[in-house]
């Protein structure tokens, strides 16, 4: 039976400590679906704050016991601050070595970038210096028309006719990126307007040489009546293309997973979906957050959830509510009884922002219909794929028996 390419679940299977530096809140783009509603050009992290953050974090070895760490850099667009990032990474390496820290040589520097500055000399020098410890994902949303529908250049002129897409500025850097990180995957975001372009976009990314496409629907309440049906149709058409063209052998799309679409087991399926509360994020002011989605620039209507700062450390009482978070303490009765609940995702920050009160224990369910549509298409995908593989296996066995029976016995 042919091998099926599986999704990469991340370095150390996603079990490393994740610490995020919000180095800037500025970006060249103004993506329409971006959850960072408070981007600005003023809030840039200083070296003094970054150094203090590192000194504090590395002094708390008893508090942070994970065997490995991912040092994550985001914005805005992180590579706008490549000089600061380079200095941070140099200092981290020196201090982890000097302290004989258990994270020394058990770390990654991680970036999610819009790709526009990827080819520049300073970014490339940084990559050469740190390549063996780097994870870089360039966001390209698919075909030109899908990408340029949402990922547009920032402008003071809001007239639709003045919008300028960023596809050409990103796609030119994809060959260089893949030559340096051949197994890297991209992240694709789906909102209501670009549902019709899902199939063509995933296939286009495969054609560009990207083998892993991590794709998800936005968690915000943006969906319209009938979106779920159109979504299901696009995924079924995509499933047909992937299977009929044997793309499943070398490519993967995260929409299709054997693990989703089953009833929940209360004992075994009770983990929180994301790492909010286990991860840590620090901003330009030196404030600490349980996740970047709880910083002010990520929130539409709620106050930021600050759990400490880099001078005084973490206030465990402010972090405590996150320690008891699980699926059952925040989900609705409908979620409990859903027959296809497994794999239905949520974002803890969106739960908080969309809740009727300032709580993290009220799950946002805007993607409910979209998840169910995904499950229906996912069932179609696996049924068709396993049927094809079984037929191929049967044919191989038949040919083997034929060859055996045709041998001349002397």
Where are these regions (language model features)?
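Flexible, acidic/Gly-rich N-terminal and inter-domain linker regions that tether
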Residues: 1-17, 29-33, 406-410
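C-terminal accessory region of radical SAM enzymes
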Residues: 233-263, 293-345
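Short, small/polar residue-rich loop motifs at catalytic or cofactor-binding pockets
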Residues: 273-277
């Amino acid at each position: 039976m042919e091998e099926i390419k599986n999704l990469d679940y991340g370095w150390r299977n996603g079990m490393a400590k994740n610490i995020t530096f919000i180095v800037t809140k500025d970006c060249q783009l103004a993506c329409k679906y971006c959850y960072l509603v408070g981007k600005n050009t003023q809030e840039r992290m200083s070296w003094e704050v970054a150094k203090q953050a590192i000194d504090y974090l590395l002094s708390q070895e008893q508090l942070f016991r994970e065997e490995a760490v991912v040092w994550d850099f985001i914005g805005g667009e992180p590579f706008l601050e490549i000089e600061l990032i380079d200095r941070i990474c140099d200092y981290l390496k020196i201090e982890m070595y000097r302290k004989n820290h258990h994270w020394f040589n058990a770390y990654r520097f991680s970036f999610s970038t819009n790709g526009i500055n990827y080819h520049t000399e300073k970014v490339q020098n940084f990559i050469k210096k740190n390549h063996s410890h780097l994870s870089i994902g360039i966001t390209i949303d698919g075909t030109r028309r899908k990408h340029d529908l949402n990922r547009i250049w920032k402008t003071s002129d809001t007239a639709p006719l003045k919008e300028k897409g960023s596809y050409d500025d990103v796609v030119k850097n994809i060959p260089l990126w893949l030559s340096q990180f051949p197994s890297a995957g991209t992240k694709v975001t789906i909102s209501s307007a670009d549902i019709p372009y899902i199939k063509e976009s995933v296939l286009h990314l495969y054609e560009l040489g990207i083998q892993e496409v991590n794709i998800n629907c936005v968690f915000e309440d943006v969906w319209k009546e009938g979106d779920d049906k159109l979504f299901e149709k696009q995924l079924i058409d995509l499933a047909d293309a992937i299977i009929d063209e044997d793309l499943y052998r070398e490519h993967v799309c995260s929409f299709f997973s054997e693990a989703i679409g089953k009833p929940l087991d209360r004992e075994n399926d009770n983990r929180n979906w994301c790492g909010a509360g286990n991860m840590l994020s620090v901003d330009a002011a030196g404030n600490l957050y349980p996740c970047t989605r709880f910083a002010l620039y990520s929130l539409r209507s709620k106050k930021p959830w600050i759990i400490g700062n880099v001078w005084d450390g973490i206030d465990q009482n402010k972090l405590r509510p996150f320690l008891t978070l699980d699926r059952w303490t925040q989900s609705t009765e409908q979620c409990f009884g859903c027959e296809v609940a497994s794999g239905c995702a949520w974002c803890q920050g969106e739960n908080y922002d969309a809740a009727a009160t300032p709580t993290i224990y009220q799950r946002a369910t805007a993607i409910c219909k979209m998840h169910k549509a995904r499950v229906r298409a996912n069932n179609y995908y696996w049924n068709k794929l396993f049927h094809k593989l079984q037929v191929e296996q049967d044919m191989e066995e038949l040919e083997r028996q034929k060859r055996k029976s045709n041998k001349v016995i002397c």
